[in-house]
Protein backbone atom coordinates (compact mmCIF):
# COMPACT_ATOMS: atom_id res chain seq x y z
CA UNK A 1 0.00 0.00 0.00
CA UNK A 2 2.86 2.42 0.79
CA UNK A 3 4.37 2.13 -2.71
CA UNK A 4 0.98 2.88 -4.27
CA UNK A 5 0.52 5.96 -2.09
CA UNK A 6 4.03 7.14 -2.94
CA UNK A 7 3.37 6.66 -6.66
CA UNK A 8 0.09 8.58 -6.42
CA UNK A 9 1.74 11.44 -4.52
CA UNK A 10 4.57 11.62 -7.07
CA UNK A 11 2.07 11.73 -9.94
CA UNK A 12 0.15 14.56 -8.27
CA UNK A 13 3.34 16.56 -7.81
CA UNK A 14 4.31 16.07 -11.45
CA UNK A 15 1.03 17.42 -12.86
CA UNK A 16 1.73 21.09 -12.13
CA UNK A 17 5.16 20.73 -13.72
CA UNK A 18 3.66 19.28 -16.89
CA UNK A 19 1.10 22.07 -17.05
CA UNK A 20 3.81 24.68 -16.53
CA UNK A 21 5.99 23.19 -19.27
CA UNK A 22 3.28 23.90 -21.85
CA UNK A 23 3.76 27.63 -21.35
CA UNK A 24 7.49 27.73 -22.07
CA UNK A 25 8.82 31.04 -23.32
CA UNK A 26 10.89 31.12 -26.47
CA UNK A 27 14.08 33.09 -25.88
CA UNK A 28 15.81 33.12 -29.25
CA UNK A 29 17.55 36.09 -30.80
CA UNK A 30 18.85 34.82 -34.13
CA UNK A 31 17.67 37.89 -36.03
CA UNK A 32 17.38 41.58 -35.27
CA UNK A 33 13.62 41.14 -35.47
CA UNK A 34 13.60 38.42 -32.82
CA UNK A 35 15.88 40.53 -30.62
CA UNK A 36 13.62 43.57 -31.05
CA UNK A 37 10.60 41.44 -30.13
CA UNK A 38 12.31 40.37 -26.90
CA UNK A 39 13.52 43.88 -26.07
CA UNK A 40 10.11 45.38 -26.83
CA UNK A 41 8.12 42.87 -24.76
CA UNK A 42 5.00 44.28 -23.13
CA UNK A 43 5.75 44.32 -19.38
CA UNK A 44 2.13 43.32 -18.67
CA UNK A 45 2.35 40.06 -20.64
CA UNK A 46 3.40 36.71 -19.23
CA UNK A 47 7.11 36.09 -19.59
CA UNK A 48 7.99 39.73 -20.18
CA UNK A 49 10.55 39.78 -17.37
CA UNK A 50 12.42 36.85 -18.89
CA UNK A 51 12.34 38.39 -22.37
CA UNK A 52 13.53 41.79 -21.20
CA UNK A 53 16.26 40.31 -19.00
CA UNK A 54 17.43 38.14 -21.90
CA UNK A 55 17.50 41.22 -24.13
CA UNK A 56 19.56 43.21 -21.63
CA UNK A 57 22.05 40.40 -21.06
CA UNK A 58 22.38 39.55 -24.74
CA UNK A 59 22.88 43.14 -25.87
CA UNK A 60 25.34 43.92 -23.08
CA UNK A 61 27.35 40.86 -24.06
CA UNK A 62 27.35 41.88 -27.73
CA UNK A 63 28.47 45.43 -26.92
CA UNK A 64 31.22 44.25 -24.57
CA UNK A 65 32.62 41.69 -27.02
CA UNK A 66 32.38 43.90 -30.10
CA UNK A 67 34.08 46.85 -28.40
CA UNK A 68 36.81 44.58 -27.06
CA UNK A 69 37.39 43.04 -30.52
CA UNK A 70 37.45 46.43 -32.22
CA UNK A 71 40.47 47.81 -30.40
CA UNK A 72 41.08 51.38 -31.54
CA UNK A 73 38.64 51.16 -34.47
CA UNK A 74 35.35 51.35 -32.58
CA UNK A 75 32.17 50.44 -34.50
CA UNK A 76 30.28 53.15 -32.58
CA UNK A 77 30.97 55.75 -29.90
CA UNK A 78 28.73 56.55 -26.96
CA UNK A 79 27.95 60.26 -26.59
CA UNK A 80 28.71 62.03 -23.35
CA UNK A 81 26.71 61.53 -21.25
CA UNK A 82 25.80 58.09 -22.58
CA UNK A 83 22.13 57.22 -23.05
CA UNK A 84 20.47 54.80 -20.67
CA UNK A 85 20.26 51.16 -21.67
CA UNK A 86 16.45 51.38 -21.75
CA UNK A 87 16.54 54.41 -24.05
CA UNK A 88 19.03 52.76 -26.40
CA UNK A 89 17.11 49.48 -26.57
CA UNK A 90 13.83 51.34 -27.05
CA UNK A 91 15.38 53.18 -29.99
CA UNK A 92 16.66 49.86 -31.38
CA UNK A 93 13.15 48.36 -31.18
CA UNK A 94 11.72 51.43 -32.97
CA UNK A 95 14.47 51.25 -35.63
CA UNK A 96 13.62 47.63 -36.42
CA UNK A 97 9.87 48.32 -36.47
CA UNK A 98 10.17 51.40 -38.71
CA UNK A 99 12.62 49.73 -41.10
CA UNK A 100 11.32 46.14 -41.46
CA UNK A 101 14.19 45.18 -43.79
CA UNK A 102 16.40 45.12 -40.68
CA UNK A 103 14.28 42.35 -39.10
CA UNK A 104 16.12 39.69 -41.10
CA UNK A 105 19.62 40.85 -40.20
CA UNK A 106 21.48 38.65 -37.74
CA UNK A 107 20.90 39.78 -34.17
CA UNK A 108 24.52 40.83 -33.59
CA UNK A 109 24.86 42.44 -37.02
CA UNK A 110 21.54 44.24 -36.66
CA UNK A 111 22.37 45.60 -33.23
CA UNK A 112 25.80 46.77 -34.37
CA UNK A 113 24.31 48.29 -37.54
CA UNK A 114 21.86 50.26 -35.39
CA UNK A 115 24.52 51.40 -32.91
CA UNK A 116 26.86 52.45 -35.74
CA UNK A 117 24.12 54.54 -37.37
CA UNK A 118 22.84 56.00 -34.12
CA UNK A 119 26.19 56.68 -32.42
CA UNK A 120 28.82 57.14 -35.12
CA UNK A 121 32.37 57.96 -34.08
CA UNK A 122 33.41 61.47 -35.11
Segments (PLM) and residue ranges:
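Bacterial N-terminal signal peptides that target proteins for export
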Residues: 1-8
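N-terminal signal peptide c-region/cleavage motif recognized by signal peptidases
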Residues: 14-19
